[in-house]
């Protein structure tokens, strides 16, 4: 059977097209395979680089672990640019050389240094030692109490602003007038009148760092520990300046000195003397201020009350009727009241301090909850006052008075 010439030509052409298509398909497959291999090679290269980095890190860590520990020492004296006398932590003193990596200006008496185990050469200068207990006393987060949240203490707020806040915010005012701002302020008054609250408000209103110390924390068992902690607290305050140091319950460490020969009393007296020395060492126009609080001013040592230490002594007294009304307005601001005359409540709450009034508001709310009401009425406050007054009569407190006042 014979085919036309055109048909034969078409068959040949189709064969060539099919062959060309197969070749292109093979080329495309090969190119795709090459691309996949290149991508895989890149991934392997990246993994290789990452492994090399991890290997280098592990090698460095291993080298660190192989390095022998250094000996700690304290500089006693610098003989010349490259030699110094060091007291090692093991006991004896040594005349040692300085490493070329150590700046001779950093070698001062009292500096902490690291010594090589074999040659005892100084290889590193350490930062000044800080007591972890003093570092823990710094408050990182500001309290959420402002002066607007304190009622009945307008005169006291004005006085503490003049002593603490104004010198920190506007020191030029004192220089223009030509007077030295007070170094510190002592707050005294019955428990619950708002002494600690005022200190919190000062921390909130100023941008200064705030270091809070409780007097009993400064009383330590072993000789010199309390004095060292006092030094570290004041050193921390200077480094963090502008700073406010608040010493709560200062009577625990600043009580009158006696002739007692017991070891505990002598250690408290040493701590007090260190506190007096640190307060005298302050620059009055410096950015460090001291606030102290106590409810026993009668037992404080006269030395700490003299002008130049606590220049201004502020009494946080019992609030009067208007003061109690201001406090009640603050505490009842978010309370659901119906038919309550706060002026009448303030009259009924005679001889109550701010903490008592806050307790009255809380108790009034509890009485409303007990009766399954969503609002508080006048009878709730009357019952709350009777309840709180009964508690106060069981544990009454007579506020001692200062016989001599300074500032």
Curated annotation (Swiss-Prot):
It is found in: Cytoplasm. GO terms for molecular function: ATP binding; ATP hydrolysis activity. Transmembrane segments: none annotated. GO terms for cellular component: cytoplasm; proteasome-activating nucleotidase complex. Keywords: ATP-binding, Chaperone, Coiled coil, Cytoplasm, Nucleotide-binding, Proteasome. CDD domains: RecA-like_PAN_like. ATP binds at residues 192-197, 331. Its main location: cytoplasm. Pfam families: AAA, AAA_lid_3, Prot_ATP_ID_OB_C. GO terms for biological process: proteasomal protein catabolic process; protein unfolding. Residues 405-407 are annotated as: Docks into pockets in the proteasome alpha-ring to cause gate opening. PANTHER family: 26S PROTEASOME REGULATORY SUBUNIT. Consists of three main regions, an N-terminal coiled-coil domain that may assist in substrate recognition, an interdomain involved in PAN hexamerization, and a C-terminal ATPase domain of the AAA type. ATPase which is responsible for recognizing, binding, unfolding and translocation of substrate proteins into the archaeal 20S proteasome core particle. Is essential for opening the gate of the 20S proteasome via an interaction with its C-terminus, thereby allowing substrate entry and access to the site of proteolysis. Thus, the C-termini of the proteasomal ATPase function like a 'key in a lock' to induce gate opening and therefore regulate proteolysis. Belongs to the AAA ATPase family. This is Proteasome-activating nucleotidase. The gene is pan.
């Amino acid at each position: 059977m014979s085919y036309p010439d055109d048909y034969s030509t078409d068959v040949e052409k189709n064969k060539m097209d099919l062959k060309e298509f197969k070749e292109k398909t093979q080329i495309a497959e090969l190119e795709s395979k090459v691309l996949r291999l290149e991508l895989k090679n890149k991934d392997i290269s990246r993994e290789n680089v990452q492994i090399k980095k991890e290997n280098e890190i592990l090698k460095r860590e291993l080298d660190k672990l192989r390095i022998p520990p250094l000996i700690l020492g304290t500089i006693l004296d610098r003989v010349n640019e490259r030699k110094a006398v060091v007291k090692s932590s093991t006991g004896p003193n040594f005349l040692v050389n300085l490493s070329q990596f150590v700046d001779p200006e950093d070698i001062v008496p009292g500096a902490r240094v690291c010594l090589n185990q074999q040659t005892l050469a100084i290889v590193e200068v350490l930062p000044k030692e800080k007591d972890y207990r003093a570092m823990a006393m710094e408050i990182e987060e500001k309290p959420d109490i402002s002066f607007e949240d304190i009622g009945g203490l307008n005169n006291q707020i004005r006085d503490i602003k003049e002593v603490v806040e104004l010198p920190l915010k506007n020191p030029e005012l004192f220089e223009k007038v030509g007077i030295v701002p007070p170094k510190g302020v002592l707050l005294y008054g019955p428990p619950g009148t708002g002494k600690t609250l005022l200190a919190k408000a000062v921390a909130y209103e100023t941008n200064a760092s705030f270091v809070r110390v409780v007097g009993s924390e400064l009383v330590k068992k072993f000789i010199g520990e309390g004095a060292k902690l006092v030094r570290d607290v004041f050193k921390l305050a200077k480094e963090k300046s502008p700073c406010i140091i608040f010493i709560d319950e200062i009577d625990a460490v600043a009580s009158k000195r006696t002739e007692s020969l017991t070891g505990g009393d002598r250690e408290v007296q040493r701590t007090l003397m260190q506190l007096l020395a640190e307060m005298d060492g302050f620059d009055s126009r410096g950015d460090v201020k001291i606030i102290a609080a106590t409810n026993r001013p009668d037992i404080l040592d006269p030395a700490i009350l003299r002008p130049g230490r606590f220049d201004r002594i502020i009494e946080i007294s019992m609030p009067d009727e208007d003061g109690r009304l201001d406090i009640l307005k603050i505490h009842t601001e978010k309370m659901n009241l119906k038919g309550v005359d706060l002026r009448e409540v303030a009259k009924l709450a005679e001889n109550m301090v701010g903490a008592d009034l806050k307790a009255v508001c809380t108790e009034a709310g509890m009485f409303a909850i007990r009766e399954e009401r969503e609002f508080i009425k006048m009878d709730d406050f009357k019952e709350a006052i009777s309840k709180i007054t009964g508690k106060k009569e069981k544990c009454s407190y007579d506020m001692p008075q200062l016989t001599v006042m300074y500032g």
